[in-house]
């Protein structure tokens, strides 16, 4: 979107979207098409809820309807915001009904009385998370794909699921970048269709 000059040089133009369409190049961005606001759409309460044909719309509706996610404010969901390590653990803790925690906080970077404190303690008690080493959990760090796969793998084991399911990572050209700790969880997550390529 912009002006092409001699020699194929390009001056970038500023995209301006109206109803999900760029007024300069007419490119469509489903994330910028507002939700229809139908009362049957749980995410319609968020001003930034993407359109129904956006790939994550149904998943957002599900987590909002089941009170697993509450948005970043009363009116925003921020669908492009990265999931933090604290967030993924909090989701699982909420899914479990937020049981009482009895153990001590094993991580020196998890402060008391934060929105995720009990979730992290619970996850550590049940061997769902083990931290990143040196007594740290890194609650605000981005949850990488292999970390999410590992946390879900340990949660499934905690729930008593059959873990003898193995997928094939050989179809991914970057499989060599998977950390040793995450190889088994990643093959499991692929087999369970929890993770696919990008």
Report each predicted region and the residues it spans.
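Intrinsically disordered, low-complexity segments enriched in glycine/proline and serine/threonine
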Residues: 9, 177-180, 187
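A short amphipathic alpha-helical interaction element
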Residues: 60-63, 88, 92, 123, ...
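Feature responds to low-complexity, polar/acidic, surface-exposed segments characteristic
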Residues: 32-57, 70-118, 126-146, 154-182, ...
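Conserved "repeat-terminator" motif of extracellular CCP/Sushi domains
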Residues: 9-10, 21-26, 91, 119, ...
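Thrombospondin type-1
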Residues: 1-39
């Amino acid at each position: 979107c912009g002006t092409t000059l001699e020699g194929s040089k390009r001056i970038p133009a500023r995209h301006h979207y109206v109803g999900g369409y760029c007024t300069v190049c007419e490119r469509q961005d489903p994330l910028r098409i507002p939700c229809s606001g139908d009362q049957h759409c749980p995410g319609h309460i968020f001003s930034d809820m993407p359109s129904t044909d956006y790939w994550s719309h149904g998943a957002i509706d599900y987590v909002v309807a089941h009170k697993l996610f509450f948005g970043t404010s009363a009116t925003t969901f921020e669908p492009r915001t990265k999931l933090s390590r604290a967030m993924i653990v909090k989701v699982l803790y909420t899914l479990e009904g937020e049981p009482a925690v009895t153990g001590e906080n094993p991580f020196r970077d998890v402060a008391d009385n934060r929105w995720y404190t009990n979730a992290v303690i619970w996850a550590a008690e049940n061997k769902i998370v083990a931290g990143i080493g040196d007594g740290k959990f890194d609650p605000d760090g981005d949850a990488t794909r292999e970390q999410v796969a590992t946390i879900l793998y340990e949660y499934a084991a905690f729930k008593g699921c059959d873990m003898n399911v193995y997928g094939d990572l050989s179809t991914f050209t970057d499989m060599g970048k998977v950390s040793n700790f995450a190889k088994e969880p990643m093959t499991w997550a692929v087999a369970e269709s929890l993770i696919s390529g990008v």
